[in-house]
Amino acid sequence: MAAEYEAGQASAAFEVRDPVLVRMASRPRGTALAGVDAADPVPGARRLAADPVLGQAVRVASGSLAHSLDRLTGDEGVAALGRKRTLSAARTLTRYARRAAARPTPFGLFAGVGRARFGSAAKAEPGAGEVAVRLDGAWLRRRVMAWLAEPSVRRRVDVVLNDLCFVRDGRLCLRTGGQERSVRDNALVGAVRERTRTLVGYGDLLDTLTRRFPSLDAERLDGQLAELVRRGFLLTSLTPHRIDTALLDGIEAVLDEALPDDARALRDIRAACARHERDSPGAGGESWHRLLDEVRRLDVSDTDGDAQARPPVHVDLHRRGEFVLPETVGREVCRYAGAIWSITPEWTTLAHMRDYRDRFIERYGTACAVPLGELADPHRGLGLPPEYGAEPTYARTGPGDEVDGPRRAFVGELIQEAVLSGGDLVLTDEVVRRLADVARHDPEAAPPRGLELCFQVLADSTAALDRGDFRLLGSPHIGAWAAGATAGRFAEAAGLTADLTRLATETSGDPDGDVIAAQVELLPREPRGLNIVQVPRLLPYRIPVGVPDDRDDPRCLDWRTLLVAAGSDGLRLLHPESGRPVRPVLPHMLALDAQAPPVARFLMDLATARPRVWSGWDWAGHDTLPYLPRVRYGRVVVMPKRWLPGRRLRDAARAKGAEVWEEGLDAWRRRLAVPDRLHIARNDQMYPVDLRDRWDRELLRSELTALHPQFVCYEDLTADGAGLGWNGGHSTEIVVPLAGARPSGGAAGTVDEERLRTAPPVRPAPTRFHCRARTGCSSSGTRSRRPTNPCSRITFPPCSARSRTTSTAGSSCGTRTPTRICGCASTATWRR
């Protein structure tokens, strides 16, 4: 009876929402591909490159590989490449060809996206592929910065001070890309700061400064302002962060007056993009070359070689067909999501935010709200979590690994049983109940408001789907904590904007309208990341971070003024004027630890970090084992079988001669019972190999001899198209948005939200008010000029801080690391 109750509770924790995104490989699995002979790779590489769809897909993906393939067409080009580069090109081309059939991850023309719905009868009609083209973010940013170097262009734009700037020790500082740059905060810079708090015309700013500083001529002032623009202290209305029709129209309007020839060239590029979109995939070779010619005619002359190797346009593939999945698939996804939620321990994900909250309470207490701009400054506040830097400055607090011992022991027992029996690790209802017991979490904790999960659908036919004869294979891209994030960048081209707006509103707000859901807008560290963040505005409120915006707009929330306060289970964000909770939303898949400004990452950590965060199956520290069994829950293959290469196999791969390598490979396969068919995987970048084939063994060897080999091997469950018949042999994934079921009636909800509905408005505190804990500390290696009150003049009723007795569980190289659902430590993003 208990097991049935647990299963029912798990199923009721989540509900399916629309839209369901389909990710589909462009080539059917099982299609015979031209083989390559390692002794003479040229003929095989030529046969692969002769495929029109693959050839065009490669040219869209990699300019450098396309150049190598062009050379392979003639003997002189082959001689110029040499054997080493020819082999490298053949390997890369083979990986691309395998990926086009085996991986549904959208990337150029290798895989496309569509939409699906749940219905009574399954249907799979992909329809013809359509190409969507836009200018590459890195190319456009480089070109815009070159235009802004022209005085005639600058005088026709608006500028605003970068909100990531701050003043310290008499200098205006800006942290971007892990580096800090600064200029002396003299009278001129101070006047610029004051005048550019909101958008102002560059020409008006220059005129104002000319009148205020008559001893400086206008040309010199213009040069000073141009340098502030070039170094990022001033953002302009042309600075690309949302590459849409409005931005391109605005650029054209400025260029029409300043540089008419460039304006005509930009219009020609846009027309060439439209012409290429009219061609079907594989048939647009001529329009593609014309498009490249138009773009490169306008390119910056001193572009480095790495930038030239990347195509200057970004291409996506969309499927306008119809996909219908039976309701049983949606119910299976909900059951699985609820089961994993029930066994998720506390603070195994985003554990650094637990420590940060403890430090926050120690310094500010529980009845104090602090402006985020002050809190993030390590000289006035706590600074951002030390994990955002190279090395944590503070030791981990918390109970330690011994608390997780029972869970680790039980998972180890399950692994041992599966390995000894040669079977799978099956998550029965009884196993789920026992895992929930050893997780030692609060069983009453509400599930997350929004979530999305990704699965590959395996069934022999649509009839098999209708009968319930299917499996759902968990994708390496597990999903995202924000429902709809995976579909975000395809919203406009795939016609999903209205659905994603509704989804973001449903999964980010609350029924009473107390919560302000605000879309975070940012500039990635690397300009090429602009291609990922191209999401239309889905929510009425927004939080710009390092991007130009109209800060006079009441729906534009300045992150520096938002208040941070301690809640019962984490930190929360409050609107300074109304005291309403603010929930940041990031509707795309940018890697925050590597690409986002640290403040933007912190905003999302504030929104997500709670004692329990849905984070997928966790091996409880056993993920360094050389072999891990398949994990199943119902019809969901949670994890396929997984093998780590190991030191002995790496040594054999690096040894001279083929004999040592072949012997080492055979020994590894015997020791760990490695099958013939595998997937070689780096996160969600995967391609299949058949270890019976000599060329495939060479592919594996080349992975092992890389400078830092970081990959794992998974069983290939779709070899020769197995389980893909329902969609014509194409590898197909679905990304299913889920909404967490909320407590009804008098059921206990989250303590903070219930209290906030009846709490008095946030109000100014008396000047004599002090926090319970005052520690006027500053960042390590720095000194504050004067002591500061660490508490903002804002108070509200204190919250209850629940004690915690759980520990963290780190990830390892053997874990299938998800794109956004992960608890990995930060890479260096804010160095102190």
Residue ranges of predicted features:
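C-terminal structured domains
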Residues: 465-711, 715-716, 733, 737, ...
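Type-3 copper protein
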Residues: 1-133, 218-528, 572, 680, ...
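Short, glycine- and small/hydrophobic-rich beta-strand elements in well-ordered beta-sheets
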Residues: 804-819
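Active-site-adjacent "gating/activation" loops or surface patches in catalytic cores
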Residues: 158-194, 660, 670, 726, ...
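Short capping segments at the starts of secondary-structure elements
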Residues: 194-204, 208-216
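Short glycine-/aliphatic-rich beta-strand segments at the starts of folded cytosolic domains
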Residues: 763-798
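Long, low-complexity, charged/polar intrinsically disordered regions in eukaryotic proteins
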Residues: 129-180
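Helix N-cap motif at beta-to-alpha junctions
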Residues: 827-831
